[in-house]
Each structure stands twice: as structure tokens, then as C-alpha cells.
Amino acid sequence: MEARLTKEEVEVLHEQADRTFFHTHFKFLRSHKGFRPKNIHMVLGTSHGGKSTLIRSLLTDICTGAVKQNVLLWLSEETELEFLSEFYRSGINPDNVKNLHVLSELDLMERYKTPKNLLRYIEMYCGENDIGLLFFDNITTSMIYMGRSPSDQAKISIDLKKMCQLLALPFIIIAHTGAAVTDSSNRLIEMNDIRGGKSIVNLAQFFYVLQTFHCDSEIYTTIRITKHRGQEVDHRFYRLIYSRKERLYGRDELVQFKEFKEIYKRRNVL
């Protein structure tokens, strides 16, 4: 195939790159104009490191936004009821949740016993329900991925990217670090600390590392943008501010690199 685009096609690509498709109040997402259609956005963090809290925070942000989008949350570790029980504890108005769809592998595994069948069902569900954003919590504990060989995980990763392209939506995938990696490790968590195969890391266009530091009695939950394909990013370090009342990250704030280094130096180390 001839690798050439017309002038008009190039202009369309440039217009899309400059456009914000999904508005958000989170600054770390606004730094690259929000979630991008046809792009995989990976969030990596330790077990009990705040990933599910971040997902609930992002979903609340989307559900309460001015522009209503149909959103699908695909779960691997919780049932639909378990998720919703925690989600509603934030006090969100049920009227704002009408566009949220939740599917759990724990509820579906008897009907869809193979990765191929489950992926086909997720793809069909997105199409039939006009889903605009897809969240997957958590790939590394999913029946389609966990315990499979590196080659099988690589194939699944490619299938997920193909589905993202076909549905033309942002695909937000949550992943665990390996068991030996903790928030109090003597280094920063990196993309390749993901549990299992690394293929999905290479295929993702955007990558965020969630890491919490304890400095004496203070807690700093940080999110770092480590990959941002096709978008310029001026700032890569942010702190997530937790609201005990809502049990969510209510907002985030920019952290300068110098400040981030100081937080890292002051962290409690076991």
C-alpha cells in the first residue's frame, strides 16, 4: 500500500490531534486534551494502591459532566453489585449514573468461557449500546489474560488494540504491578513493572503510573504520565487529592519536578 496521504487527510488528522473529545476537570488528562479515541490508556499501580479509587473518580467526573457519554466499565475482580455498592457511597446522584454500564467477568464467565467469546461479547455490547468510553479494571486479573503464556498475552493485547480501533473509542486499561513491586520500593515504578507480559505496554499510546509515597504522617498519591504518543505534554507529575467524605480523588494538582524529587527523597522507606 502506498504510504501517502492527501492534503485534506493530513488536515483532518491535525484537527483531530488538536481537538478535545472528552472534557474533564482532571489536570493530568487535560495536559494531553483528555482521553483520545482509538487510543489505549494504561494505568499501572500496586495492589491496593488506589487504582479502583481512581477509576471511580474518573467515572464520577464523566457521569457528572455537562456532555453525557455512554460509558462501559468491564470488571474482572468485582461483581457489578460490589462495584455499585462502593460507587454510590460517594453520594453521587443516581440520575447521573444512567449512562454508566457495568459488566463483570464474575457474572459472565459461565456464558463466555473463552477469551475470544468474551471479547466478541464486549465488542458487540459496545456497538449495540453506543458506548463512548471503555474502562477495563483489571487486565492482569482477567480470565482473558491472567496465567496465560507470554505469546497468548501478546495475542490478547493485539486483539484489545484492534477492538479499540474498530470501536473508535478511548480504552482505559488498569493493570497491577508484579508482586515484588510496592509503593515503598527504593525506586520509581516503571511501565515494565507490569505483571505478566509487556506487549500491552508497547501497544498503549498513553501510560500513567500511580504511586503513593508516605512522608511521615502525610500521604502523597501521585500520577506520572510516562507515555503520550501524538500529544505534547508540558507537565508529567501530578498529585491526586483524596476526599474522605466522597471516598474519591476529588481533584489533582500539578507537581513541579523539583517538588516531586523532594517528596521522593522524604518518603518513608522500610
Task: Label the model's feature ranges.
Residues N70-L72, I172, Y208-L210:
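Short hydrophobic alpha-helical runs that function as membrane-insertion/retention elements
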Residues L73-W74, F135-F136, L169-T177:
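Structural recognition of the conserved hydrophobic beta-strand(s) that form the central parallel beta-sheet
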Residues P150-D159, E190-I194:
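Charged helix-capping and loop-helix junction motifs
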Residues M1-F28, H41, S47-S52, C63, ...:
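C-terminal regions of RecA-like/P-loop NTPase motor modules
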